[in-house]
Structure formats: structure tokens, C-alpha cells
Amino acid sequence: IVAAGSLLGLAINRGNFSFPVGKVDMLTMYPLSFEEFLLSTNNETLIEKIRESFETFTPLADVYHNLALDLYKKYLVIGGYPAVVKTYLETENYDSVRAVQADISDSYIADMTKYATPNETIRSIAIFNTLPSQLAKENTKFQYAVIKSNARAKDYELSLQWLKAVGVVLENIKVTEGKLPLTVYEQLDSFKIYYSDVGLLCFKSGTFPQDVLVNSSISDRARG
């Protein structure tokens, strides 16, 4: 039997039934990485050239360098959700891409209302919708005050944990030293929160695809 679901872990925690320990193999799925995006767009040769350049510490030839930059900009807009990538490959239309991303965003919010308590839902949606503002700050550290002026960590911690548990967002914790194991040096009260998909960030921030695809210096003007 093969089963798939983004909320399987939460269903197990909330359900009143026994779990067959040792009889279920779990595999966590993530959006496509940039390398997987290149594979999906039939750019295997470019992958090999990038890998070869990295391993030999030699510059990438201009023709491959420019191609890689163009495809990376597309990846920033499209992201790695399979349905979004599939839509782009079939249509090459960014309005269609945005429509699928909107559906995914709405589906996440619908899941929050279905599986979380009413208070958790309100706070989870608030966190979810304000991430672009968090990442656009000069200091991109996650701050509860961005959600609401008088917001406190204790009021939103549970909702943030919920979003992380279902894979909607990813947490990046600051470390005081770059030594192994990194967990020993984690500064737990200083962290950043990202959407699990870069294309979703582009969509939720309201960034127009052409601003990323055409402007060569988008990183000089954009934040997040």
C-alpha cells in the first residue's frame, strides 16, 4: 500500500488509533531543487558542466554561465512544486504558473482551517502571509512584532511549530560558531523563516515574473 499526504504526521498525532511501528516506511518529499528543475527542463548537459566547473575550480564557459543564470531566474519564479513545473513545461505561460501557485497557497490556508484549532488557524495564516515582510526587512531575523505590533512569542510559537511540522515553512537557526555539530552552537531565539518553495515566495511577495526574468540586477533592488 502506498499513501501520500502532507499532513500524515499530524493525523497520526491527533487520531485515536494505534500506529504500526516498524511496518511503515516514510519518505519526506520536497519541492524540486534547482538541479532537479534543470533535469525536468532537459538540461542534463548544463548540470554536468556546472558540476565539472565546481569540482575543478574552473570558471564556467560564458555560454553555459548565461544559460544557468537564465534558468535560475526562471526557477526563482516557478519554484519546485511539481504541479507548477508541469504547468510551465506544458504552457510556458507565467499567468498559468501563477494560477497554480495561487491554488497551492489557498490549499495551504484551507488545510490550516481544517486541521488546526480556530486560534491556531488565525495565527498560522498571519505568519504565512507576513513572511515576505519578514524577509524584506534589513534584519531578516523572524520577529513576532511584524505579524502584529503587540505580538508575543508565546502567542505564536505553537502556530509556527504547526507550519514547520506540515512542511509549509522552513526554519534557519543562527549558529554562534561554524563548528560541528552545529546544533551545539544554535542560538534558538534567533532564526529566519522561509516558505518551503522559492516560487511561492515570489508569488506571495507580489513580485512580477518579468522583474526577475528581465532585470539583470534584481538582487540589487529586491529583498527577501
Predicted regions and their residues:
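Interdomain motor-coupling "hinge/lid" segment immediately C-terminal to the ATP-binding subdomain
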Residues: 5-6, 11-136
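Conserved Walker B catalytic segment
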Residues: 1-3
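Accessory nucleic acid-recognition modules appended to NTPase machines
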Residues: 86-224
